[in-house]
């Protein structure tokens, strides 16, 4: 959906473009959606999770372990934001989200540095909630100015940095798909 016809097919080819104001378009589309209960689908997903549980090396301080400990400490009641990288995947997989609007992430958009600003915004919107940003060392270096903002305005957020001394997801892809040809 885009209000500007010139944007359609500009960067990627669109199968079904919709030209218009997003509010108006969605207002017209929403009544056409038939709500389907997801109970059966959710049960299937839970069965797959039970059959193929996520595992990691529990003898070392790993990213998944850190995320699970954050979950235990917060009893799942925190709002979690993430930057981009392996820590983002661990936060999505190892923190057990049970409520909507408790995972703030840019998904696959690759926006390093997103998490801390999102964390600050969430804390401003929900001052009574514990709000935690989970970042890797690479992402953490992207936005120290936001940390200064949180400090200056006394915004009580929690910043967790999972430091593996490398851009972890980039390194993982180079290992898996590029014959261990690493960029420096």
Where are these regions (language model features)?
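Active-site-proximal loop->helix
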Residues: 9-13, 147-149, 169-178
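Thiamine diphosphate
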Residues: 89-167
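Fold-independent oxyanion-binding glycine-rich loops
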Residues: 1-4, 21-22, 44, 70, ...
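Conserved thiamine diphosphate
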Residues: 25, 175-184
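Active-site diphosphate/adenylate-binding microenvironment
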Residues: 46-123
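Hydrophobic alpha-helical scaffolding
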Residues: 12, 16-19, 38, 52-61, ...
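Glycine-rich, acidic loop regions that bind phosphate or pyrophosphate groups
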Residues: 1-44
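Short helix/loop capping segments that flank catalytic or ligand/cofactor-binding pockets
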Residues: 8-11, 27-28, 90-91, 143, ...
């Amino acid at each position: 959906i885009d209000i500007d016809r010139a944007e359609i097919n500009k960067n990627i080819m669109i199968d079904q473009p919709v030209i218009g104001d997003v509010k108006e378009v969605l207002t017209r589309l929403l009544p056409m959606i038939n709500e389907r209960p997801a109970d059966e689908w959710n049960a299937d997903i839970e069965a797959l999770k039970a059959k193929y549980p996520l595992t990691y090396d529990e003898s070392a301080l790993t990213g998944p372990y850190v995320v699970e400990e954050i979950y235990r400490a917060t009893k799942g009641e925190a709002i979690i934001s993430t930057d981009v990288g392996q820590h983002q995947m661990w936060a999505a997989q190892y923190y057990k989200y049970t409520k909507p609007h408790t995972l703030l992430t840019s998904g696959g958009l690759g926006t390093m540095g997103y998490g801390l600003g999102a964390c600050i915004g969430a804390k401003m919107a929900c001052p009574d909630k514990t709000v935690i940003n989970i970042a890797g060392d690479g992402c953490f270096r992207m936005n120290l100015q936001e940390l200064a903002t949180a400090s200056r305005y006394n915004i009580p957020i929690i910043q967790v940095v999972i430091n593996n001394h490398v851009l972890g997801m980039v390194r993982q892809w180079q290992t898996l798909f590029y014959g261990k040809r690493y960029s420096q």
